[in-house]
């Protein structure tokens, strides 16, 4: 939700969600659900591309190439399910003559560089790693697990990292 909202706030009109991962349902599915829910609610044109780990990155390159017309990408905002994928997509786009953030804005997800004391390598949705760790320990140490909620949502935040056109 937050990534799509940020991209729209920065002027993007046609968004793309990219994911590579397991075929087993997981957290990145929730990222896609939030992305799609925001886009539908805001009337924003969007597409998604879901790949399995075994597919590798080649299908992303083919998809991106097929969506470049007269030197322009059909999308002006892309949300990738991880920061690592964001950096791979940025590299592919650069090789195809598409620049971030000038031609397309990219946002990743995890923000682990920030928690390691480094500046983010891409604009990202930051997970609250210390709070996540504390919550996990609390759950593990809880004697009576019968009243645990089926879902615990922790607050995420946005951090600019050079792949979006953030106001100064």
PLM features per residue range, with description:
Residues 1-2, 18-63, 79-87, 109-111, ...:
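Hinge/beta->alpha junction and helix N-cap segments in small-molecule ligand-binding domains
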Residues 10-15, 73-76:
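Short acidic/polar active-site loop segments enriched in Thr and Asp
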Residues 12-14, 37, 57-61, 100, ...:
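Secondary-structure boundary/capping motif
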Residues 13, 31-32, 157, 161:
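Short, cationic motifs built from Arg/Lys/His that form the positively charged side of catalytic pockets
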Residues 14, 46-48, 99-105:
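Short acidic capping loops at alpha-helix termini that bridge into adjacent secondary structure
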Residues 65-168:
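Flexible loop/turn connectors
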């Amino acid at each position: 939700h937050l990534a799509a909202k940020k991209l729209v706030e920065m002027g993007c009109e046609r968004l793309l969600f990219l994911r590579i991962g397991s075929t087993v349902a997981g957290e990145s599915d929730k990222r896609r659900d939030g992305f799609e829910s925001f886009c539908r609610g805001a009337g924003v044109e969007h597409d998604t591309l879901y790949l399995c780990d075994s597919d590798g990155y080649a299908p992303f390159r083919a998809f991106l190439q097929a969506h470049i017309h007269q030197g322009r990408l059909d999308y002006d905002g892309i949300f990738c399910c991880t920061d690592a994928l964001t950096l791979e997509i940025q590299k592919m786009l650069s090789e195809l003559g598409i620049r971030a953030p000038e031609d397309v804005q990219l946002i990743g997800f995890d923000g682990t560089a920030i928690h390691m004391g480094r500046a983010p390598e891409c604009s990202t949705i930051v997970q609250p790693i210390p709070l996540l760790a504390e919550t996990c320990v609390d759950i593990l140490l809880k004697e009576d697990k019968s009243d645990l909620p089926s879902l615990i949502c922790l607050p995420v935040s946005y951090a600019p990292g050079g792949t979006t056109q953030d106001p100064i």
